[in-house]
Amino acid sequence: MPRSSATARKNQSNRNENGASSGKKVAKQKSNGHLNGSLNGGSTPGSVSSSQVDLPSSRSTSDSAIAPAAAASSNLNGISDSSKEDCNGREKLNGYTKGNADMSYVQTNGAGSQNGGDHAGQASHRTDKSATGAKRSTSNASINPLQLASTILKSCPMYDTIAILIFLLQLPPMVLTLVQFLFASLTFMPPSGASAGSLSSNFDIFQGPAGTPSLSTMIAMDGFCLLIWALLMWTWAQNFALDLAHVQVAITLGGGGSGKNGGVNTLCVGIVLILHLIRSKGIQDFVIGHLLSSNIISPDLLAQYSHLLPTEFRRTESQTSPSWIRSLLAVHILAQAGTAMARRSMAKNRSPNPPRPGKRVDTEASAGSQTQIDSAFESGASVSSYLGPDGQLITPTAHKDGRDRLLSAKKRRRQANQVRSRQPFWAALASTKVTVMREYEHSRALSKTARGLPMTENDLQGVSFDDGLVWITDVDASTIKFAAGDFASADDSGLSGACEDGRLGNEEIEPFYVCVNGALWATATISRVPDAQKGSGMVHWRGEVSGLAPNCAYTCSFMRSDTDEEICAISVKTPVTNDTEQFSLVSPPPQPSYRPSSPTTTLKNSIVNAEAKLNEKRSRLRKAKNDHKLIISKIRKELDNYNHRLHSGTDENRQKQRSLQLERNIRQTEEATALLEGQLDSLENIPEEELREWSDQKAKYDQELQLLNSAKEELVSARSAVAREVSSLESDLGSTVQRRERLQSRRTRVNEQYERIVSANAQGLNERERRAAEQFAREQDQAKLEANFNEQFGSIGQSVQEYQLRAQQIWQQCDAIEQAIQQQQQRMLLDSAPLTPEGNLPGTNPFSETSALPLGALTSTAPNSRSLLGLSFPAIKSSPLQTISSALDASSSHPTSPVQPPSFLNFPASPLVNATSHLDSDFTYRDRSFSNRSARSSLYGSEFLDSSRRQPFQIDLPELLGEKRNSGSDSTALKSGLRPVSSPFQRAGSRGSGSGSNGSGGSGSGSGSPSSAYGKPN
């Protein structure tokens, strides 16, 4: 609950919003309490910029000491005291006034007015008013202790925790799962004060940003506990862990973990353990089994006292495993509880030494607020003191002590979050309500000031100034400029007229005065705008508050001069000075303050600030004087040096000095030359030992060089050999790859063929059966045809036999005719005469004279030639049924030599041929007659007879006989060893073709070339 400002300023309130004890109480402390706390006891300090003005903590409506004073004061605007108290009880932001919150604005960019008027009597007048303010503050200090105690809620963490645990154990499973889910989701929310950049950093393994574990730590702990949960825990242990999660939720919501001892934790865990011992069969079996195995109790004793347990507590069935949703939530809650315990233990190890005895330290106050050092002003400041960030005086001893105790911003934020996490549930709700209300008031104030934009005096047109209005026009590092409207009313018409006529003194024409941090500010100047008229102008008064310290928070209170009533209070923070040289000797403080100081502290800060400025200017002046003195002395020295050189130096002296310098240089050069010549002489004579050593080293070098060259040659040869091997292997590899590719292509083709064959076979199963049926039908037809052909062959064989008999008779007749012709030819040859009177022609050789051969040889037929008349017949194969062969057949079965004519050609000369003819000589000796056939016209050519002789004309009898044969076979040929004579008149189809039949009851056919039948007996 918020306290009154007067009470806070006097008593240094010792309670915060959570009911915990505050920091140490400083005796006779006159500064404002909660210097670094937020408004209304909030935990987060509000940062106020230089362009934004905030009001201090307002007085509560329960402040009984303020009500009489407010009732006694006069009301210029006709507003009741209760409404003023209500307005004063609310928190005023952005310069809202006490009387009318809608008429209060803050202007930071307005132009400040010139300070006009005479201010000679202001100091004495405000000194008289200070006594009245002191009396009012004394009267406000009287507050009822019972009323103050009734506003504080007592903290009972043990009772709250046990009550919440009992409530959670009675909830149904669905609602309990929802509660656990909401509680688990709170662990993933970033704490207050955590930035986006700090969420990605890890302070250490258990301590994350802003006092919370990092996301990676939470995930790792959840995974580790989930692994233990799934692998190493029984069913009864999982159910027990679920209830332990309820204990963690109850301890967190009830604030049971904020105590120094673990009594609440032990009590809650004991309650859950006793319940499970009574109701869980698994735990009973587990505990009893261990007790019996360790011989702590005997089975008889256990059976004796087991009947005392009520029947409803005896569970016969085992508990089922919890659902995976509740298991995940319980694992997460227990894992974060273990992480919190580890972080607390580490925080204890990291915490500084405990404070000295007799001092009480508030954890939250030390984490969220700055150490108060205002007591340094009360005890007196030394000469070596300097200003703090808010204008406070800090001695070296106090600064060293405070610097040791101050924490970094991150560590303080972490500690504040740790303290906030230990707050009970009702305290968190109260803090949330206060924060929401504060933000609501702040947003409403911003909306009324045009979304926080800086306002000018032109923006205040149409605003009522009946109750008076004060606003800030400019805020500087050491000054605050403000403007005010008209404060005169109907009741003060006489006073207003006197002010306008100038009949009153300078002290009485100022309707208000300024107090800074509760102290009457003597350096505040207020001047009236001369051109402003009543009701027609907006700005009637302008003023300036000077003598302030930069980067400090101030509360400027505007008080009425006649009634000492507070018109409004505005909180302003001066910006940092732009002068970089100012306060260069003062080291920067550890942490700036955003709350105003006490009146005494403010006055002392102002005095010290002015003295510091004066000292700074004096030090600058002294430093400038010293610098100027040093520069002047340096310039004078240089001037004296130049004058001395100018007056003392002549041409002769300069030439002498130059000659001496040259002589000195020449002497040094000669000495260096002599030294170098001595070194050269010593280097020309080489010692024998060094020469021998050099030769040995050179020989070793040459030997090593030869070894190196040989090694290089071996390396080159080895590289070439390896290169050849590599090239051969590469060629083998290439050939192998090509062969492999060919085999692969062949394999691909074979696979394709195989697939086609398989598909064809699969498709041709029915075709095969059809073909088998057709083949069977064809075989039957062929069997019928074969039987028919056999019958025909039998009839043909009989006809062939008949033809053979007839052919034999014809051959006999032919033999007789041929014999007669041969005889006639012989007689013609014997009786032949020369064809010319001169005798034989050259080149002719009569047969009677030149040839020693018998006459029968002339008519003989060589195997490859023809007879004279062409009546030689080829051999005719006889039928195998023929049993009687003639003498001609016998002689023809054994062919003779080509030179010797066969015996059947030696026929006796016919008597008809004895007569000579006039054609004999011409027939005999004419080489180119028709009868003189060329050997080249025959098939085989004449090899033994004289080719120049004219051969007798022969008749191709086999051709004549072949025309009569229907079958075209040569079965009727004569059985002779003569080769068939081919004639140009013979058909091509009759050459080398023949057929025969077997007379043994069978029939057959054959074919062959003429040469194949030669020399083969039948």
Curated annotation (Swiss-Prot):
Cellular component terms per the entry's GO annotation: membrane
Listed Basic and acidic residues bias regions: 82-93
Amino acid composition bias (Polar residues), ranges on this chain: 1-21
Coiled-coil region list: 601-788
Protein keywords: Coiled coil, Membrane, Transmembrane, Transmembrane helix, Ubl conjugation pathway
Membrane topology: Multi-pass membrane protein
Comp. bias regions, Low complexity: 45-74
Signal peptide region: none
Segments crossing the lipid bilayer: 162-182, 217-237, 258-278
Top-level division of the source organism's lineage: Eukaryota
Compartment(s) of residence: Membrane
Residue stretches of biased makeup (Gly residues): 991-1007
Region described as Disordered: spans on this chain: 1-138, 342-371, 581-602, 962-1018
Role according to the record: Component of the regulatory network controlling carbon source utilization through ubiquitination and deubiquitination involving creA, creB, creC, creD and acrB. Involved in resistance to acriflavine, and required for normal growth on a range of sole carbon sources, including fructose, cellobiose, raffinose, and starch, and reduced utilization of amino acids, including GABA and beta-alanine, as sole carbon and nitrogen sources.
Family designation: Belongs to the acrB family.
Protein name: Probable ubiquitination network signaling protein acrB
Native source organism of the sequence: Aspergillus clavatus (strain ATCC 1007 / CBS 513.65 / DSM 816 / NCTC 3887 / NRRL 1 / QM 1276 / 107)
Protein's gene: acrB
